[in-house]
Structures are given as C-alpha cells and as structure tokens.
C-alpha cells in the first residue's frame, strides 16, 4: 500500500514521469505538476549564471580570430614568449616522483604528511614561536580558493561568525565565497580612484566601524586587483584595530614571493603572529610554482595553544570531509619535496625571483611607453604597484573599446595582468590604451 501524499518518480522506457499516489498525492500533483515533465518541474525556471568576470575574458580572447590580440585578463604568469613555464624544480620533482612510482592511494583528510609543517615554516619562518609551539593547524587545500572556502565555512558554521569585510575593490571570488556561506558583507574602502592610490584613512575609518567577530579579509601582499600594499606602519595600525575591535583577520597570501621575496612578503603575517592574535592564512602555490591546474594550497589557523590547534584541526577535517573528502596528491608531493630540501628551496627562490623581475620590467616598460606617447594620463603609478596586476583606472567603456577595436582583453573593472605583457606587445598595448583614454 502506497502512503498518502507521495509523488512517485516513474520510469517509462527512456522517459521519466511524475505519478501521484493516493487522493492527497493526486491533489498535490494536480495543483503543482499537471502537464509537466519531471525536468520541467526541477529546472525550467532556472536562468543561466553570468560568465565569470575574469575567466570570461579568456573565453572572449580565444574566440577572437584576429592575429594581433592580447590577453590581459587571467592571472597566470607567462614568459616573454607568452607561455606559462614549468619550473626546473618542478621538472626535477616530477622526474623523481615518476621513478618512485608512488601508489595512488588516498591522502589523509588534512593532506600529505609533512606538507603542513613545511608550509608553516615558509609562512612564519622556521624559528617562529608559532611553529615551535605547535599552536597552528595547517590543512592542505584545493589551491588558495579552497583555503578560503574551507576557512570561511569553518568560521561561519563552526565558530558562528556572521559578518565579513573585504576591501573595496577585492578579488571577486572573495565576496562570492562569503555570500555562498551566508555572511553579511560590509566592505571597507581601500582604493581612491580619483588619485589612483591607496586610501588608508578611509580603510581605518571603516575597519573601526565593524562589529566584533567580523571576519576581515586582508591581502598580505600584491593586493588583487589594485597592486597597492600597506607598509609596516600601516599594518601596525590595522593589527591594533583588529585587536581592540575583536575582529578576526583572514590573510589571503596568493602571491608570496612576487613583491620583494618569500620572507619579505610574509612581513604582514609575521607581524600578526607576533601580536599574539588568533587569525587565519590562505596560501596558494598556483602562482609561485606555476602549478595552476594542480590545485595546491593550504589553510592555516593560528590558535592560542597546541591543544586549541589540535581541536581546530578536527573541525577543519570535518569541513573538508563533507566537501571534497581529501585533497589530490601530485601537487603536494612536488611542493613538499621543494620546501623540505634546502638546495631545492634555494633553486625555487631563484626561479621565483626571475619571474618577479620580469613583471617589474614590464611595469617599467608600460609606464615608459605611455610617457613617450604623451598619454593624457600619467601612468607612472604602474611602477608603484606590486604583483601580477595593475588597476589602470580604465572605465568599463574603455575596456570594451580596447577589446572591440584593438583585440586587447582586460577585466571590466580596469584590472590588467602585467604578465600578459611582453617585449613584442607592450608598445601596441600602450598605444592602444593611450588612444582610448
């Protein structure tokens, strides 16, 4: 006998239909599903999601048949030849892995054994009190995005934080992940479009106005998209505001090594560590190792004691288990081999330094060319920004004109990836920008 009120799913050949069970079920069916196919009932009201504002740029670029075109949208490092290189240290590690023929068994939920310890040493320094005391929990994640997702879910669902604050502007996925988790987002001002510079006074004012237990997302270096970073004195002010206001800092470190060097770029994080606060760090190795498709990152939660960190680790694993269960191994093996070997680590720092210097040279080349052309705006600010990106101040209309008339593709908000520039296209890009100003 069928229970009253059920709507049964019935397969008829290759067709799937809804069928009522009993009088109550028939009433529900007649009121809601009459004349509808099952797929109509489930998905017919959906509308297409908008294209990703960053990845959509690359899609448009690829569809452009013109031979002279430039992709300044996606944030990936490229050589002067326009390719994303495989680092020598990565080649060596992959060769060793192939020879070792390691079984493809599951990794632990927290990731590859030893990986977290070496990540902590890179982030905080090998002699850091945090590392030596064991009062931080580090878990391997699916890139930096995965670290943000796990950390934001942990703080919302486990720790009960309901308000988050991100810089205005910020990387778009910050707000998307926070919104999906359920946070109310209160942005803090960061960038002054009228002067194309950091607006620190406004940032301080907005941070001071945030309620206690607000998760504050901070860019530790190479701010995305503006390229403007805080100096040490400004970081001291931010740390004091977080301490007095009971705010929870979440530092996103996607570009360690791309501003001044691995240790130099960890300055802000090490200042937070010295303050004694509890905070979170998202680390990405996508850029620094050019391992974009391996999805290798880490989430670190700094606690007040080892006992507290051990408990936090159990909760982080619970978040991961009901999400993706456990992380992939290949990228972790590569990164762990390099971080754990002083000689390989030094080689990696050298290769990373080469990438950093190429980006700097392209910043200077763009600024110099804009000056030579006598552009309507002074573009010297590009050399004062750091990292892969420059916030150009171009309007959405100017960005669209670059794409349509010149085959130069950038993010709608005016962000360009400096890595897309090279010695063959920088003059063309500068000339095109000058013409749309």
Locations of the language-model features?
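Cationic, low-complexity basic patches in intrinsically disordered or flexible, solvent-exposed regions
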Residues: 3, 20
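Structural signature of PLP-dependent enzymes
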Residues: 313-331, 338-367
